[in-house]
Curated annotation (Swiss-Prot):
Family: Belongs to the glycosyl hydrolase 13 family. GlgB subfamily.
Function description: Catalyzes the formation of the alpha-1,6-glucosidic linkages in glycogen by scission of a 1,4-alpha-linked oligosaccharide from growing alpha-1,4-glucan chains and the subsequent attachment of the oligosaccharide to the alpha-1,6 position.
CDD domains xrefs: AmyAc_Glg_BE, E_set_GBE_prok_N
Database matches in SUPFAM superfamilies: (Trans)glycosidases, E set domains, Glycosyl hydrolase domain
Gene: glgB
Catalytic activity of the protein: Transfers a segment of a (1->4)-alpha-D-glucan chain to a primary hydroxy group in a similar glucan chain
Presence of the UniProt keyword Transferase in the record: yes
Key words, A-Z: Carbohydrate metabolism, Glycogen biosynthesis, Glycogen metabolism, Glycosyltransferase, Transferase
MF-aspect GO terms: 1,4-alpha-glucan branching enzyme activity; cation binding; hydrolase activity, hydrolyzing O-glycosyl compounds
Gene source species: Prochlorococcus marinus (strain NATL1A)
Protein name: 1,4-alpha-glucan branching enzyme GlgB
Length: 755
């Protein structure tokens, strides 16, 4: 039956559709009731003929109201059980009608939870989802853009023309459209038309995959299809207190750890060759390793070194390599530089198989201004504050999230849960927390707005961080949440129910700066700076601290760790060994940046890879061997980690020998009373008869010595250990007389009492 219904209103609708100004295509397109019949209207730009195909009939549709609105009349509601055959320029194809799939994807409860900021799994609704509706395979698109005039899906499916697939606006500023026939790997973006008539092409904020830079489109990708094999790991993790475990972290940047030749085969997890991703223009002939290649190389390397965790600098999709990953545009997608999301899942799964946890750097403090990203998303300051005194980091050239907006907080909190849920990560390190906590961070007077109490604290950011940590531990009780917080803000690692921020670890930035300042001093002048290496204990038990020597300390002219050290090469190596050993024996969990474990000489360069050729030289092998043995010692001796955050776990023997730059202390394990004695000599002068007090008589075995020849040292030591003498010193009746090698750290363990 072919009946044309002439409606003046449809001419206006057609005009608005053709100009991408229509926010409710479902009101006119698809099956529409008309008296006792049904009109089927199809929007098909640039089509010359459209035919409706049902199981019973075929109808050539007419376009009496607008050249691209085709319609016909049926006796009954066909639902979405029909197809349309389209002729464009003599080329025909058959498809299902997107506007016949009218059921709301985002339900009332979903909208309510999202609007109040409490939808912890919002990614299961937002974004592009491969799904089936009424036995029709396709993709459901769902986007939050409340101030947009219209939103269209664009991609290869419509030659990136926003006129073809306008989305339907729902309650709460949600836009939806189901497009049948799309499949995994298809590219798409959202074309957003603003109230002022401006048009933006935006990547999907909730996209699960994006193109390799410099391309910017989102990629349709499956979730929940990967077959995990780490159930035992996850169960064990979530049923123990991570703070009562040894934690030794290898911080790394996947793109600059190691490169491969562009001539080497570049093969994905399906065994398919694909175009290599260049490492950088400044390094022609090299390419990035894939997630699969990284798994094959990084995991055995880290396991051999003895680290318990890998911390990855941000791998959320980001357009600019030079940002190191800290300017994110694809929050719900691992970067495609190294492969697909499932290939990253396989990387994590392989880490867990080998007993290695994964920590990701997470950057909820700011985002870049890239046009395809979150900035000015729907023609309004949707994700950021509108006032630059609140919403912009001018020094960084980035924007600040509006933490007071529920939907924005929801975006971030759900993103945190997403990485644990979808990629089985074990922890996060939150970058630049201080920049979130203080409204005047890096701002001169007059360029920030005080809070309601007249102070500089950002209460909105505080509440966001508390919510994020509370929700994280609610879902994943064994997780690590680490704050990079560089000030003295109180309660960073206190639980949220005690008005803390809720992290369970905080980088000890003060320790890091004091240590590096101290070790850069000529050893003969260190006697005047003894406080640098002892002061950290004064505040050590106020927070749950992690000691970190991070990437920030080996860039921008600061030199790599080895080259910070004074003296000739021998002293540089010895100082490096001593610093690392002091770090491993000091209370607190551990993190070092890649390259430090073998004495990298050059500053870290994001465009280059590490100086692996240095391992051809014995001193660098020695540092690597030292780190291996430190990690093994650390994991083997509970006194070095079980009591990190309790004053009982640490006791000075002597911290006042400034003249010799020597310190001595004990680490104690609370369950069986075992303890270790640590003695550090931070000058090149060895001491052949250096006496320290000890709490119990007997034999003290020397279980570690940074001056051992296997590490590149001079091999001075104590012939395996020393027995005590009844000689009162440092408040103890018993003492041992030690040989202290130059620039060294000794670890001794009480073995037996005298008869």
């Amino acid at each position: 039956m072919t009946v044309s219904i002439l409606l003046d209103s449809l001419k206006d609708d057609g005009q608005r559709l053709s100009e991408c100004r229509h926010e409710s295509p479902f009101s006119i397109l698809g099956p529409q009731p008309f008296k006792d019949k049904w009109i089927i209207r199809i929007w098909m730009p640039e089509a010359s003929e459209v035919e409706l195909i049902t199981q019973q009939t075929k109808i050539k549709l007419q376009n009496p109201n607008h050249e691209w609105i085709f319609e016909g009349v049926l006796e009954k509601d066909p639902g979405n059980d029909y197809q349309i055959k389209v002729n464009r320029g003599g080329i025909e194809h058959v498809q299902h009608d997107p506007w016949s799939f009218r059921k709301e994807w985002m339900g009332e409860i979903d909208r309510h939870l999202f609007a109040e900021g409490n939808h912890h799994h919002i990614w299961r609704k937002m974004g592009a989802h491969l799904t089936e509706i009424n036995k029709k395979q396709g993709v459901m698109f769902c986007l939050w853009a409340p101030h947009a005039k219209s939103v269209s899906v664009i991609g290869d499916l419509n030659s990136w023309d926003g006129r073809h697939h306008p989305m339907q606006k729902r309650l709460g500023g949600i836009w939806e459209l189901f497009i049948p026939g799309l499949s995994e790997g298809d590219l798409y973006k959202y074309e957003i038309r603003t109230e002022k008539g401006h048009c933006y092409e935006k990547a999907d904020p909730y996209g699960f995959q994006h193109e390799v830079r410099p391309a910017k489109s989102s990629v349709i990708s499956k979730i929940d299809s990967f077959q995990w094999n780490d159930q035992s790991w996850i169960s064990n993790r979530d049923n123990r207190d991570p703070l009562e475990q040894p934690i030794s972290v290898y911080e790394m940047h996947l793109g600059s750890w190691m490169h491969a030749s562009s001539d080497d085969p570049f093969i994905n997890s399906n065994g398919e060759h694909r175009a290599p991703v260049p490492a950088a223009d400044m390094k022609p002939g090299s390419r990035l390793l894939t997630y699969k290649e990284l798994a094959n190389k990084v995991i055995p390397y880290v396991k051999e070194r003895g680290f318990t965790h890998i911390e990855l600098m941000p791998i959320s999709e980001h357009p600019f390599d030079g940002s190191w990953g800290y300017q994110v545009t694809g929050w719900y997608a691992p970067t495609s530089r190294f492969g697909s999301p499932d290939e990253f899942r396989a990387f994590v799964d392989s880490c867990h198989k080998e007993g290695i946890g994964i920590i990701l750097d997470w950057v909820p403090g700011h985002f870049p201004k890239d046009q395809h990203g979150l900035a000015y998303f729907d023609g309004s300051h949707l994700y950021e504050h509108s006032d630059p005194r609140v919403g912009e980091h001018k020094e960084w050239g980035t924007l600040i999230f509006n933490y007071s907006r529920n939907e924005v907080r929801n975006f971030l909190v759900a993103n945190l849960i997403f990485w644990f849920d979808q990629f089985h990560i074990d922890g996060i390190r939150v970058d630049a927390v201080a920049s979130m906590l203080y409204k005047d961070y890096l701002r001169p007077e007059g360029e920030w707005i005080p809070n309601e109490d007249g102070g500089n604290e950002n209460f909105e950011a505080v509440r966001f961080l508390q919510q994020a940590n509370h929700v994280l531990f609610q879902h994943f009780p064994g997780a690590l949440s680490i704050a990079e917080e560089s000030t003295t803000w109180s309660g960073v690692t206190k639980p949220t129910d005690m008005d803390g921020l809720g992290f369970n670890l905080k980088w000890n930035m003060g320790w890091m700066h004091d240590m590096l300042d101290y070790f850069e001093i000529d050893p003969w002048f260190r006697q005047f700076n003894q406080n640098n290496i002892t002061f950290s204990i004064c505040y050590n038990f106020t927070e749950n601290f992690m000691l970190a020597l991070s990437h920030d300390e080996v860039v921008h002219g600061k030199s790599h760790l080895l080259h910070k050290m004074p003296g000739d090469d021998w002293q540089k190596y010895a100082n490096t060994r001593a610093l690392l050993a002091y770090m491993w024996t000091h209370p607190g969990k551990k993190t070092i940046f890649m390259g430090m474990e073998f004495g990298q000489r050059q500053e870290w360069n994001v465009w280059d890879d590490l100086q692996w050729d240095l391992l051809n030289y014995e001193p660098h092998k020695g540092i690597q061997k030292l780190v291996d043995d430190l990690n093994n010692l650390y994991k083997r001796e509970p006194a070095l980690w079980r009591n990190d955050f309790d004053e009982y776990g640490f006791q000075w023997i002597d911290c006042d020998d400034n003249k010799n730059s020597v310190i001595s202390f004990m680490r104690r394990e609370k369950t069986d009373g075992e303890w270790l004695v640590i003695v550090a000599n931070f000058t090149p002068q060895n001491h052949s008869n250096y006496r320290i007090g000890v709490p119990v008589d007997g034999f003290y075995e020397e279980i570690f010595n940074t001056d051992a020849s296997q590490y590149g040292g001079s091999n001075l030591g104590n012939m395996g250990g020393k027995s005590t003498d009844l000689y009162n010193i440092h408040g103890y009746e018993n003492s041992i007389d030690l040989c202290l090698p130059p620039l060294s750290v000794l670890v001794l363990k009480h073995k037996s009492k005298k008869n």
